[in-house]
């Protein structure tokens, strides 16, 4: 079996005609293409293997390390792991699950935070998909609400 690293953006893979009849394109976050070939080195199967990111969450004086898949939110993994983190709408709207991104990056394009607030490193766990290993610190809801309202009035 061969494993090929792929870029972290939409990729197109083209293989010569003996291997595959056409090319295909798909979005990737943190993945490799794993293929199996037969005795004549013809491609017989292919699958995408995504690597989970290490996300460290600080909450209630404790630090917890999570392995979060690229297609799951940090909130869903935190809840599955037994962390008692606040949340409500699970849609990135109510601002009940705020956090400060200490290191790393997340895709939170589905959340409703203003660009100014996002640029300052704030995130909503329910709308955050890791795009790298991260360190996140839970913050009081009031801290994010006051910042979001202040930037809305600018």
UniProtKB/Swiss-Prot annotation:
Gene3D superfamilies: 3.10.20.30
Organism superkingdom: Eukaryota
Residues in coiled coil: none
Co-factor: note: Binds 1 [2Fe-2S] cluster.
Keyword NADP: no
One of the GO BP terms on file: electron transport chain
Transit peptide residues according to the UniProt entry: 1-56
Residues that hold [2Fe-2S] cluster according to the record: 89, 94, 97, 126
Entries under PROSITE patterns matching the protein: 2FE2S_FER_2 (PS51085)
Necessary cofactors: [2Fe-2S] cluster
2Fe-2S ferredoxin-type domain segment(s): 57-142
Entry keyword set: 2Fe-2S, Chloroplast, Electron transport, Iron, Iron-sulfur, Metal-binding, Plastid, Transit peptide, Transport
Gene Ontology cellular component terms for the protein in this record: chloroplast
Keyword match GTP-binding: no
InterPro entries: 2Fe-2S_ferredoxin-like_sf, 2Fe-2S_ferredoxin-type, Beta-grasp_dom_sf, Fd_pln
Record's subcellular location: Plastid, Chloroplast
Induction section of the entry: Induced by high light at protein level, but not at transcript level. Strongly up-regulated in response to acceptor limitation at photosystem I (PSI) in plants lacking of photosynthetic [2Fe-2S] ferredoxin (Fd).
Pfam families (alphabetical): Fer2 (PF00111)
GO molecular function: 2 iron, 2 sulfur cluster binding; electron transfer activity; metal ion binding
NCBIfam families xrefs: fdx_plant
Family as reported in the entry's similarity comment: Belongs to the 2Fe2S plant-type ferredoxin family.
Function of the protein: Ferredoxins are iron-sulfur proteins that transfer electrons in a wide variety of metabolic reactions. Mediates alternative electron partitioning in conditions of acceptor limitation at photosystem I. Accepts electrons from photosystem I (PSI) and is capable of electron transfer with FNR, but cannot support photoreduction of NADP(+).
Name by which UniProt lists this protein: Ferredoxin C 1, chloroplastic
UniProt source species: Arabidopsis thaliana
């Amino acid at each position: 079996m061969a494993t090929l690293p792929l870029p972290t953006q939409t990729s197109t893979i083209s293989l010569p005609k003996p291997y595959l009849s056409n090319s295909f394109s798909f979005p990737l976050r943190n993945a490799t293409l794993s293929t199996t070939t037969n005795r004549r080195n013809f491609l017989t199967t292919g699958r995408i293997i995504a690597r989970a990111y290490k996300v460290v969450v600080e909450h209630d004086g404790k630090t917890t390390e999570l392995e979060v898949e690229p297609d799951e939110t940090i909130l869903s993994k935190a809840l599955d792991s037994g962390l008692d983190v606040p949340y409500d709408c699970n849609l990135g709207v109510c601002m009940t699950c705020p956090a400060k991104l200490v290191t790393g990056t997340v895709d939170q394009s589905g959340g409703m935070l203003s660009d100014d607030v996002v640029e300052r490193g704030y995130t909503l766990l329910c709308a955050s998909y890791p795009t790298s290993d991260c360190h996140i610190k839970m913050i009081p809801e009031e801290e994010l609400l006051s910042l979001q309202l202040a930037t809305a009035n600018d």
